[in-house]
From Swiss-Prot:
Gene: mutM
GO molecular function (one): class I DNA-(apurinic or apyrimidinic site) endonuclease activity
PROSITE patterns (alphabetical): FPG_CAT, ZF_FPG_1, ZF_FPG_2
Organism: Burkholderia cenocepacia (strain ATCC BAA-245 / DSM 16553 / LMG 16656 / NCTC 13227 / J2315 / CF5610) (Burkholderia cepacia (strain J2315))
EC numbers on record: 3.2.2.23, 4.2.99.18
The protein, known as: Formamidopyrimidine-DNA glycosylase
Tree of life domain: Bacteria
Length: 275
């Protein structure tokens, strides 16, 4: 599933093409994704100029004067920028095209767990949308600190890894990045969130920011489907310290990496480096 780094890589790849450009038309070939595509989306966006492209968590927010269209990539979704001249014929899983003067922005999603939604300006700020309002803080914002994590986890018995994945404290720390961040911070993923000290949470906040920044720099992680807007795969998975390295020696101490299951997801850690 595309997580924050993959969505941010997509945003950075798309924004230079669409910001300041007008949508000539929208071709909706699949009316039902995770939720129904708004029936009037094509008409709402016709001849509208894209003012900005923002990311909130794993959602992409495309602002036009009348509102925002919101895109979530789901499990297998991608957004590609394709030249209008000679654009490939839409394949089975190519659900929506936004046609601009010189290129096409194409949404592809084999499993159809992604979403394309519309938030009109008269409904208020897009960040008040029901899907966005309850999200945690952005990991690169000043609000994301070890003190925040420490305060929000007092008395919680859930594991620190599952607390990170929940998304109500901080957004975008998916399974890969939770395992990697906890390794960098030296925290065992099974530790109860409420028992992690403030200094260790301060290290964890720094580790989350560093891990996500490194992943964005490497184009995200491509484990199966993800490609950026230019069709290129990400390479962060090649740099992982622990994720998907069960039985292999720790890159720091040489101890074999262990794999366990937490909340039906695989977790990887070093039993020596992480306490």
């Amino acid at each position: 599933m595309p997580e924050l780094p993959e969505v941010e890589v997509t945003r950075r790849g798309i924004e230079p093409f669409v910001a300041g450009r007008r949508v000539e038309r929208v071709d909706v070939r699949t009316a039902m994704l995770r939720w129904p595509v708004p029936a009037g989306l094509a008409e709402q966006l016709r001849a509208r100029e894209v003012l900005a492209v923002e990311r909130r968590g794993k959602y992409l927010l495309f602002e036009v004067d009348a509102g925002w269209f919101i895109v979530h990539l789901g499990m297998t979704g991608t957004l590609r920028v394709l030249p209008a001249a000679g654009v490939p014929v839409a394949a089975k899983h190519d659900h929506i095209d936004w046609i601009f003067d010189e290129f096409v922005l194409r949404f592809r999603d084999p499993r159809r767990f992604g979403a394309v939604l519309w938030h009109p300006r008269e409904a208020g700020d897009v960040h008040a949308h029901p899907l966005l309002a309850s999200l945690g803080v952005e990991p690169f914002s000043p609000a994301f600190t070890g003190a925040l994590l420490h305060a929000r986890t007092r008395g919680r018995t859930v594991s620190v890894k599952q607390a990170l994945l929940a998304g109500d404290m901080v957004v975008g720390v998916g399974n890969i990045y939770a395992s990697e961040s906890l390794f960098r911070a030296g925290i065992r993923p099974t530790t109860a969130a409420g028992k992690v000290s403030l200094p260790r949470y301060e290290r964890l906040a720094d580790a989350v920011r560093a891990t996500l920044a490194d992943a964005i720099e490497r184009g995200g992680s491509t484990l199966r489907d993800f490609v950026g807007s230019n069709g290129e795969s990400g390479y962060f998975q090649l740099d992982c310290f622990v994720y998907d390295r069960a039985g292999q020696p720790c890159r720091v101490c040489g101890t074999p990496i262990r794999q366990i299951v937490q909340g039906q997801r695989s977790t990887y850690y070093c039993p020596t480096c992480q306490r």
